[in-house]
UniProtKB/Swiss-Prot annotation:
Species, as recorded: Arabidopsis thaliana (Mouse-ear cress)
Quaternary assembly: Interacts with GBSS1.
S-S pairs: none
Induction context: Circadian-regulation. Up-regulated during the day (at protein level).
Residue stretch of the organelle transit peptide: 1-44
UniProt KW keywords: Chloroplast, Coiled coil, Plastid, Transit peptide
Name this polypeptide is given: Protein PTST, chloroplastic
Major subcellular location class: plastid
UniProt-annotated location(s): Plastid, Chloroplast stroma
Superkingdom of origin: Eukaryota
Record's keyword annotation contains Chloroplast: yes
Lineage: Eukaryota, Viridiplantae, Streptophyta, Embryophyta, Tracheophyta
One GO CC term, this protein: chloroplast
């Protein structure tokens, strides 16, 4: 005997499925349409009914998918064609300006790091030049002493003169001039070399930083606290070349002037003055 086809109708939250689960049929009895027509009428009617339902369901699912796709495209077109509101425009402008400022700040930091590396290289070269000049000055000083001894021994008979002076006296005067010139060069090198400068702030605070014209007001230098029974002293060491600088302290997020240093300017333009000799 043949087995009756079992029809499964399943529903889920994501999709609807219609499936036919045909159990094993006796193919010998269903090899022609006449055999199918001999099935009981209720079974045939039920089979036709479920077949129609499956077609309707397929059409419904295709329609729903098409409507959803069309709806999403319509929403996208509407959002693109709709003009920006004032708040959206302000937010867009703020984001654009923020991106520009971040880019400029990054470029400034890169330039600052490059200049610092160059400064360290120049400081090293200046130190080497100063050392070489100091050694040369010692040698010239020894030659000056030797020339003085020769001049003090007296002028041998037959000694020639240069510019109205005997060669012994002429040599001594020339060595003196060279020694003075080298001392001036050493002073110039020392003026170009950075010096340690102690900067401090006295008062009660959690954090203290200093900025100044010594680096173009681009970096904040942190000051370390030193506690005592009477007060708190924040200090740091800067390496600066001789000159006049202006600076200001950032104390707990507020710009302040230290009474320990002289000032220049008025109002918001008032700054402390730092002189490096």
């Amino acid at each position: 005997m043949g087995c009756v086809p079992r029809i499964e109708f399943g529903c889920s939250s994501q999709s609807l499925t219609l499936s036919w689960n045909l159990r094993a049929w006796n193919l010998c009895r269903l090899n022609t349409i006449s055999h199918f027509q001999k099935l009981p009428y209720p079974l045939v009617a039920s089979t036709r009914k479920h077949y129609k339902n499956s077609l309707l369901l397929k059409r419904f699912l295709v329609g729903v998918g098409t409507e959803e796709s069309s709806l999403s495209e319509d929403l996208l077109d509407e959002s693109l064609s709709r003009p920006l509101t004032s708040d959206e425009l302000k937010s867009l402008l703020i984001d654009t300006e923020r991106s520009k400022l971040v880019k400029k700040l990054s470029e400034a930091n890169q330039q600052n790091r490059f200049l610092k590396r160059q400064l360290k290289t120049q400081e090293h070269e200046i130190t080497n030049i100063k050392t070489e000049l100091a050694l040369m000055e010692l040698e010239v000083q020894a030659l000056v002493k030797l020339a003085e001894e020769i001049a003090n021994l007296g002028i041998p008979q037959g000694s020639r003169k240069i510019s109205g002076k005997y060669i012994q006296s002429h040599l001594l005067s020339r060595l003196d001039a060279v020694q003075k010139k080298m001392k001036e060069q050493i002073k110039g090198v020392e003026a170009a070399q950075s010096k340690e400068v102690h900067v401090f702030w006295i008062g009660m605070a959690e954090s203290v930083q200093v900025m100044g014209s010594f680096d173009g007001w681009s970096q904040r230098e942190d000051l370390s606290p030193e506690y005592s029974a009477l007060f708190t002293k924040f200090s740091t060491t800067l390496f600066l070349r001789p000159g006049r600088y202006e600076m200001k302290f950032l104390v707990d997020g507020e710009w302040q002037i230290s009474p320990e240093f002289p000032t220049s300017g008025e109002g918001l333009m008032e700054n402390n003055v730092l002189v490096v000799e």
